[in-house]
Regions:
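Short, conserved glycine- and acidic-residue-centered signature motifs
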Residues: 199
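A polyanion-binding, active-site-adjacent surface
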Residues: 3, 15-163, 167-170, 175-177, ...
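Generic N-terminal amphipathic, Lys/Arg-enriched alpha-helix
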Residues: 1-13
Length: 220
């Protein structure tokens, strides 16, 4: 597996990479890439970490599964490459940013600009078969990303966790609300966004928290 990952993350997660489950996961993923159409491309599997080094981390957003449509997944949860139409959840995220902060809806769904400011856009499962949602669930990725969240919770404080939907909320439950800012809402999917994602004001609330602890706010 082409593990392109920021050096500080590599050091923090080095023991995880050596565990038997991760070796089995690596074998599975290599076999899948060799025999099937898998997203994102191999060099982007760990892109969320490469774009957001541990020492710059301010915000954690947890997704579930990469997009499984052609040309969509780029290694950051909810993000798509330049020129790719916005999936519905991303459209709703941008709508809430606009309503909350007054920022215009961007022309690109590429969230590199968030990651480079310290937003870890972490899917629970980092790979998927084309057109088969959750096809790589249950093979070890969840254990690995649980370890990521646990490392953040143990080594960092003053982190904002944006937990959208019950899956993300379970995964982020380890974070201490006394030492961090925990923002919860329903998932931005069209199935649920109108039940509390719209109007949650997570983006302005995140920036207020960052300013309160002397950190630069995110340009959403």
């Amino acid at each position: 597996m082409d593990v392109k990952i920021a050096s500080d993350w590599k050091e923090i997660l080095s023991e995880e990479f050596e565990k038997p489950y991760f070796r089995e996961l690596t074998d599975f993923v290599r076999q899948e890439y060799a025999s099937r159409r898998i997203f994102p491309r191999g060099s982007n599997i760990f892109r969320a970490f490469d774009k957001c080094p541990f020492d710059k981390l301010k915000v954690v957003i947890i997704g579930q599964d990469p997009y499984h449509g052609e040309g969509q997944a780029n290694g950051l949860c909810f993000s798509v490459a330049d020129g790719v139409p916005f999936p519905p959840s991303l459209q709703n995220i941008f709508q809430e940013v606009a309503d909350d902060t007054g920022s215009p809806i961007p022309t690109s769904g590429n969230l590199d600009r968030w990651a480079e400011q310290g937003v870890l856009l972490l899917n629970a499962v980092l790979t998927v078969r084309a057109h088969e949602a959750a096809s790589h669930a249950g093979h070890g990725w969840e254990t690995f990303t649980d370890a990521v969240v646990r490392a953040i919770a143990q080594l960092k404080q003053g982190i904002i966790y944006m937990l959208w939907g019950s899956y993300a909320q379970r995964k982020g439950a380890i974070a201490d609300p006394q030492r961090n800012c925990i923002l919860k809402a329903v998932h931005p999917s069209p199935l649920s966004a109108y039940r509390g994602f719209f109007g949650s004001k997570h983006f302005s609330r995140a920036n207020e928290y960052l300013q309160s602890i002397g950190k630069t706010p995110i340009s959403w």
